[in-house]
Amino acid sequence: MEEIIMYSTSWCVDCRRAKQFLKDRGVNFVEVNIDEEPDAEDLVLEVNEGRRKVPTIKFGDRFFACSPFDPYQLSSELNIPLKK
């Protein structure tokens, strides 16, 4: 599987849900907190047409926002099982 990077914040409920969804399925990912990494925040703004949407996920060479959290979207975008 290609590397998954989740751009998130510590206060984001949707980020916590997305992280738990991935952990429950044994999916490895790297988390980048955009409140602590200004360059990462700039990237999130760029790929979301100026919107600060978290979580934003990079999978391979493409980005998508999963905000609000949608397990069906996350499962489909990453090609992982919906059910544990």
Language model segments and positions:
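Non-catalytic, surface beta->alpha helical segment in thiol-disulfide oxidoreductase systems
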Residues: 59-84
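Thiol/disulfide oxidoreductase modules built on the thioredoxin-like
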Residues: 45-53, 64-69
